From Swiss-Prot:
HAMAP family: UPF0102. This is UPF0102 protein LPC_3309. Pfam families: UPF0102 (PF02021). Gene3D superfamilies: 3.40.1350.10. NCBIfam families: PRK12497.1-3, YraN family protein. It comes from Legionella pneumophila (strain Corby).
Length: 118
């Protein structure tokens, strides 16, 4: 995904999630261990969200494109974020995936797409 398409997809996802009651905490958290596209709050949950845009859905949607290694990077970046901001054990967490069909911009929201045990 090009950087421009990625930003567009993230903005679509952010707007969609806000419309569905989530509040933005941080966008594009980067550390040496990995990156998190969106960090949001839903009720008491801190939700770590990976945004995927696929122009060709023949090979599966967004979740199918997330490898074990990518999940591990997201989990490590999440741990880094929680330690950095001293919030470990203060919030239940969840890993979601937003999959966007690059042709129609149809959004699919996969809650609890994976867990720290992958």
């Amino acid at each position: 995904m090009t950087q421009e398409k990625g930003k567009f997809a993230e903005q679509l996802a952010l707007n969609y999630l806000k419309e569905n009651g989530l509040a933005l905490v941080m966008q594009n958290y980067h550390c040496r261990l990995g990156e998190i596209d969106l960090i949001m709050r839903e009720g008491s949950y801190l939700v770590f969200i990976e945004v995927r845009s696929r122009s060709n859905m023949n090979f599966g949607g967004g979740l199918a494109s997330i490898t074990y290694e990518k999940k591990q990077k997201i989990i490590k970046a999440t741990s880094h974020y929680m330690i950095k901001y001293r919030i470990q054990d203060k919030f239940p967490i969840r890993f979601d995936v937003i999959s966007i069909d690059g042709k129609s911009n149809k959004i699919t929201w996969l809650k609890n797409a994976f867990d720290a045990g992958c």
